[in-house]
């Protein structure tokens, strides 16, 4: 985690110094951060956006009490992929729909900013080793959200 201005400067300098190598390799780097939205926006826009972007974690944002709509409106054009996860305010990962993530707001906001990236299920584990059933439930929940809210 970047905690000081010096650490931030070192990270940004490193990324900028290695930008061309990363770009030439065809690699894109998605940064996941717990910075509050305006700080993350200011930070990520210091980097070339054809190589560096944001991995948006729905559950982490809910846990930190951030407004999904405000975040996505602020830097949605730089979101490379989305972790579909649910967490209560200040808590840990829970099954989708049981935390404070506002999936309607997330998917609607992503649609409005023209998001076309991946949705990655980073969900709570099955409690009774019925992993396939639980994953299918999460997949169906996510597809429902996309169908219902990721439209005009």
Spans of features found by a protein language model:
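Active-site acidic/histidine proton-transfer and metal-coordination neighborhood
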Residues: 1-53
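Histidine-acidic metal/acid-base catalytic patches
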Residues: 37-56, 60-152
